[in-house]
Each structure stands twice: as C-alpha cells, then as structure tokens.
C-alpha cells in the first residue's frame, strides 16, 4: 500500500480523495493555484504546495509542476480526480517515467477511449451495441450527405475528441448539414485541437444510463450497477440517481454484461464508467469515462462500496475484494449538483463570495463540498459548489428526502441551482420517472415558472433566518481556529 498520495485536483473531489487516504492511513499532498490558496482542500491535506497562477493552463494542467511536487514530497502515487488531467494520457506516461503510480487506467487505454471514433470501433469489435453511423472521421460534405441519407434524419454531428457536451450538433434536414458540419468542426478545432467529426443517428428522446465498472490488474472486472443521468442542460448532467427508475433485473444483466465486456476487451484497470443511451428497449454505447465520476457517491450509497478507496487499493496492486455476486443494491439514491449558476439566466456562471452558508443534514443525507462561509468562489474553474446526495428505502422516499434537504440548504451571496433542483423535485413527470435527455427543454416553461415562485419563497425564508448567520468577525475567528486544527492534524 502507498504511504503518500498527491491529489492533482481541487475542491470537493480533492477532499473526497483525501478522506479516503486518511481512512487508509495514507498521507495526502495537495497542489493548488494562487486562486485556491484559501481553499478548504489545501487545509485538509497533510501537505500543500502552490503550483502556479489561477488559469488551469498555468497550474492544474502543468504536469511538470505537479510531478516536481510529487518528487519533492515523496508521493508514490497521483490521484487525478475528475476533469483537468484525469483523462490526459500524457500524465500517465510522465508518471511512469518517474516511477510514480497513476491511480487510473493505462495511458494507452485513456487515449483510445478518449477518441470517440476509436472507442466506437473497439466497442463494435467487442460486441457492444453502438449507435448506427460512421466509425471514421468525415470531412467531405457530399460524403456526409450520403451517410446521413443512409441512416436517416435526424442525425448528430460529433467531435471525435469531444466531451462534456461540447462539439455536438443535431441536424434534422439536409439543408442544415453543411452549416452544422462547419460549425462543429470549428468548435472541435478550438476546444480540442482536433477538427475531426463523425456522424451518428440522432436519438430524440433517449435516457442516459451508465454503469460503474471496477477492474484490478489481474483482469478481474465487475460492475456496480447503474445510474440514470438524463436530467441535463446542454448535454451536461445536473441530477443523477441510482438505480435508474426503469431498470429491471433482466435489463441490468444485459447492460451490465455489456459494460463488463467493454472493460475486459480493452484491458481496463481501476474505476471507470461505461455510458449508454437507452431508447425503445434498446441501448447503445455512448462513451467510456476513464476516471472516477462526479456522481460516484450515489453508487457508493446504494452498494456500500467506497469507490475511491477501492481505486487506491487496486492501484497498489491488490485484487478486487468482491465478485459480481457480492454487489447488492439497497434502496435509492439521488444527487443534485449545486452549482454557482443562475438557472433563470440559462445557467450563467455566478462566481462570488459566499456570505451565508448552512448545509443540510439528517438521516440519509450527504454533502460533498469544498466551500465555507465567506469563501470566494473563483471564476477560473467549474462552477460546482457541492454535491447533495440523499438515500431512501425507495425512489419516492429519496425524492421526498431530497426536497427536505434542499429546503434546509442555504447559500447566500451567489445565485445557485438550488431553485432548479427544488422545481425538478416537484415536477410530476420527474416523480413518475418519465425521464429523457431533453427533459429540461421539454418542461422548461413550467420549471422556470416554478423556479420564480421558489426564489420568492426562499427570499422570504432567508430574511427570517438572517439572524442565524454569525457576524463576519466571529466567522473569521472560527475559520482561523479550523485552520489551526487542520494544520495540527498534519503532524
């Protein structure tokens, strides 16, 4: 087992990994940018080192600086979290050169699955269902028109190197095709440095269902059931739940077997997620995320498996401690991503200072966060404030518990997505489990109307509770005391 791990990330996921390290008796090392010098994760770590200016390109994406710190601190392994360098194959290559273990799959696997065309070809060879379309890049408009005609409109044009919903464009008629191709190629070149695009059949109302997989270095692979991620905006997830409301034992067997087959075929190691689109009884491979996912806590809650600790164990050379038969699902879990965004302004980012903060609690409630009262949310990174996770004996109890937890969650000073989540929990179609990836767009008018009502209700509640928030001088004193405590823990 490792004695010291460097966490090459920030915010809540950095703290999440550090907690796992602490439970395993492993020292943790934080790296941080100038903008994060007062961030909670830097104080939670046993050691912390500044690595550059606020821009990710000058800090969290600096492989050279991160490896310098790893060597200086004596870290034997690096956990990349999610985002930043988590799916950059070069990090693994550089770690290998320095004799440092990257907690994740091999660089060649990251590279193969990070390219949508390559991954689709591999999945076809593995016998995993894929969406009808091309399995090579398309640049000629005439060829694109022939392909679109053969598979039938609507089609979707995707960037081969894309991810996070960036570089995707649906096309409903041939007249739109050339313009859509040019636009997608331009976005792909700008965002990913690769203008290659491909074409697939566009599924208009699919569900987004993914399977968590875990594999060790001896070739043992299992799945830890499914997650439903259909509540999205601009192809980016907002709410996840486990298991999927439509999942049956038979469907889980089929989809889970396909996910395991995918991981086995590419020689996968560590934690990963195989994502599918589900439509009219059929499912199709979408992509594989070669890292821990933002939404991993809901899988932990329903299975009782600490995925991050298992990542560390597997990376240290241990075999999986359980088989597929050992994985049992208990109850239902929901996760709401609490972002510093204005949901009534098309989810525009809203960084700033948190002037009031009270997180929810009670049975079946978990908050993964990296913020605190008077914390300044920097504008340079993802807008996530926290992840609110609840568990219930069944889906209905989980929804009601989430409603209660959201009603307790108070964040002042910045606009957040809390009103959006409250509106979704009240939505009858959501409560019935009638989900698809265009749910938010379809019910937008009703959701917006409900949010406006909620914002007014929340404002009245906050005014009544203002006295519960401590004066800033007392907060500063408490923060200093917490800082002293955290530093004393490093000894």
Curated annotation (Swiss-Prot):
It comes from Methanothermobacter thermautotrophicus (strain ATCC 29096 / DSM 1053 / JCM 10044 / NBRC 100330 / Delta H). It comes from the Archaea. This is Pyruvate carboxylase subunit A. The lineage of its organism: Archaea, Methanobacteriati, Methanobacteriota, Methanomada group, Methanobacteria. Its cofactor is Mg(2+); Mn(2+); Co(2+). It catalyses: hydrogencarbonate + pyruvate + ATP = oxaloacetate + ADP + phosphate + H(+). Heterooctamer of four A and four B subunits. One of its GO terms (molecular function) is metal ion binding. Inhibited by ADP and alpha-ketoglutarate. It is an enzyme of class 6 (ligase).
């Amino acid at each position: 087992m490792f004695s010291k791990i460097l966490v090459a990330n920030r915010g809540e996921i950095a703290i999440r990994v550090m907690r796992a390290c602490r439970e395993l008796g492993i020292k943790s090392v934080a790296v941080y940018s100038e903008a994060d010098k007062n961030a909670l994760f830097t104080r939670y770590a046993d050691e912390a080192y500044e690595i550059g200016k606020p821009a990710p390109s000058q800090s969290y994406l600096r492989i050279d600086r991160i490896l310098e710190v790893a060597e200086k601190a004596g870290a034997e392994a690096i956990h990349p979290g999610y985002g930043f360098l988590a799916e950059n194959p070069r990090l693994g290559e550089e770690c290998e050169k320095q004799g440092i273990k990257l907690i994740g799959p091999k660089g060649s696997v990251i590279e193969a699955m990070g390219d949508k065309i390559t991954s689709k070809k591999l999945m076809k060879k593995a016998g995993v269902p894929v969406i009808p379309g091309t399995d090579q890049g398309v640049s000629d408009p005439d060829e694109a028109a022939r392909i679109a005609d053969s598979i039938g409109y609507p089609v979707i044009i995707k960037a081969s190197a894309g991810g996070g919903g960036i570089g995707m464009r649906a096309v409903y008629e041939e007249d739109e095709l050339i313009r859509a191709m040019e636009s997608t190629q331009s976005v792909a070149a700008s965002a990913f440095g690769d203008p290659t695009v491909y074409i697939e059949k566009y599924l208009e109302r699919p569900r987004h269902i993914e399977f968590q997989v875990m594999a060790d270095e001896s070739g043992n692979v299992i799945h830890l059931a499914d997650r439903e991620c259909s509540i999205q905006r601009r192809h980016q997830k907002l709410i996840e739940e486990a298991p999927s409301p439509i999942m049956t034992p038979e469907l889980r067997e089929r989809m889970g077997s396909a996910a395991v087959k995918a991981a086995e075929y590419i020689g996968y190691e560590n934690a990963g997620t195989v994502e599918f689109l589900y439509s009219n009884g059929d499912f199709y491979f979408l992509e594989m995320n070669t890292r821990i996912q933002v939404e991993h806590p809901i899988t932990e809650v329903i299975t009782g498996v600490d995925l991050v600790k298992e990542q560390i164990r597997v990376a240290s050379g241990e075999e999986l401690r359980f088989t597929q038969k050992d994985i049992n699902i208990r109850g239902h879990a929901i996760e709401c991503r609490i972002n510093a965004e204005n949901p009534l302004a098309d989810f525009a980012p809203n960084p700033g200072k948190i002037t009031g903060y009270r997180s929810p609690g009670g049975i079946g409630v978990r908050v993964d966060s990296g913020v605190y009262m008077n914390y300044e949310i920097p504008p340079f990174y993802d807008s996530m404030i926290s992840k609110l996770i609840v568990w219930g004996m069944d889906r209905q109890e989980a929804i009601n518990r989430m409603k209660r937890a959201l009603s307790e969650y108070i964040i002042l000073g910045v606009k957040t997505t809390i009103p959006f989540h409250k509106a979704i929990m009240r939505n009858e179609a959501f409560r019935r489990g009638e989900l698809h990836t265009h749910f938010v767009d379809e019910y937008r008018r009703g959701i917006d109307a409900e949010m406006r009502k909620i914002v007014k209700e929340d404002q009245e509640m906050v005014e009544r509770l203002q006295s519960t928030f401590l004066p800033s001088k007392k907060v500063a004193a408490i923060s200093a005391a917490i800082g002293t405590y955290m530093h004393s823990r490093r000894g």
